[in-house]
Amino acid sequence: LDPYARVEAETIAWTSRIKRDRDRPFQWAPGVKTTRSDKVGMVVTRITDLDYIKVNRVDFGRSGAKRFKANVASETDGGAIELRLDSLDGPHLGTLTVSKTGGWDEWQQQSVPVSGATGTHDLYLIFRGAGDAPLFNLDHWTFSR
């Protein structure tokens, strides 16, 4: 995957559910959800603490990435996107602290410097924040050199 081209977050989103047993309702397992925005199309929504997206075989090249940029929307401050290589606790590239944008469908591009992203790796976008409330919505992301 080319991280220097715009990557739509929802094209790699996953969600799952599990059933506890026959006579009880479904319980949702951790995962991301999608919805349609009138302004930008499909997005990853209702992101909560410890949800994550994994992207396989991201080729950062020899010179590597210097910056991560994401198109986000949020009514509140307090969410973040932690960037890691190869596993949930792998090498840390950087963390984008998501600032309030004015609403769940008010979109802004926000960015953060990154380091250590060279070669080909699996990339983890791990969402962080306090409590169980939704943190922000994510439309697309990209890296720059």
Placement of each model-derived feature along the sequence:
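Extracytoplasmic
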Residues: 1-145
